[in-house]
Amino acid sequence: MDGNHTIWIEKYRPRRLDEMVGQKDIVVRLQSYVKTGNLPHLLFTGSAGIGKTTAAVALAREFFGDSWQTNFREMNASDERGIDVVRNQIKEFARTSPLAGATFKILFLDEADALTTDAQAALRRTMETYARTCRFILSCNYSSKIIDPIQSRCAIYRFRPLDREAVIEETRRIAAAEGLTVTEGALDAIVYVASGDMRKAINALQGAAILRTDIDEETIFEITATARPEEIDELLDLSIGGRFDEAEQALLELTHVRGIAPNELINQCYRALVQRDIDRTLKVKLIDALGETDFRLSEGASSDIQMEALLARFVLAAEQHR
């Protein structure tokens, strides 16, 4: 096993569209562009780790063959968000002629929603001016942050989180290739940790493989610093049940002893609450409290104070509801 020396998300990244996991409808539509030999500007939208970058690179490989690297450029808009990156780097690539007999080049702009409004306006003009020599594939997490003039000039593809079967199938394939034994419990843990993000799933598997070749669920939760679903359920039960002191101890165990990040706990609590069968009014109050805490943490508030305050809000909301 050479897994310790390579990054698996690159080692096992699909090279062709038909090798992609999930997104079958999108793959079929992208393949149709290859067959016709023409490509509009594209906008890929969806959460991280679900195949947007892979689809763009695979599309370039199929359009350009061996010369794909000379006619394809990948940029990340979050590195430089301002208008200068559009006026200089993007425009410079777009204006030059394609090579090796290609009829156009492809510029893949990841995290395009990080661009400022002015930068997006400049990008729109560049897309129009150089449409003959360059096609743009924009990738974003939130299409609402892309200005309408750009959206109207693109074919929009909404990528969905990978389902359980797709994550398990790909995890098993990689585990077999690396000579790993993965228990069913570990597969369930990977599905839970990944939450539809194949990049997370592969990173979790590689992280566990560094420790051992026989991988169980305990290894997955440990290596990813993730609470077990039952631990989240216990935290919710204690706080909703009014047992603040016990909930506080459970929280400290997860954050201070296990080192689980507060924002990760908030995300896990949210996922658990959405699935929980409780009164709708109480559920709304609890999710609202999670959102408030998440916002305050993003603003730089003390994580210890905010997480304890969250438990207090849970306790009070449940008491008021009784």
Swiss-Prot record:
It holds the Pfam family Rep_fac_C. The keyword ATP-binding applies. GO terms for molecular function: ATP binding; ATP hydrolysis activity; DNA binding; DNA clamp loader activity. ATP binds at residues 46-53. Keywords: ATP-binding, DNA replication, Nucleotide-binding. GO terms for biological process: DNA repair; DNA-templated DNA replication. GO terms for cellular component: DNA replication factor C complex. Gene3D superfamilies: 1.10.8.60, 1.20.272.10, P-loop containing nucleotide triphosphate hydrolases. Disulfide bonds: none annotated. Heteromultimer composed of small subunits (RfcS) and large subunits (RfcL). Part of the RFC clamp loader complex which loads the PCNA sliding clamp onto DNA. Belongs to the activator 1 small subunits family. RfcS subfamily. This is Replication factor C small subunit. It comes from Methanoculleus marisnigri (strain ATCC 35101 / DSM 1498 / JR1). The lineage of its organism: Archaea, Methanobacteriati, Methanobacteriota, Stenosarchaea group, Methanomicrobia.
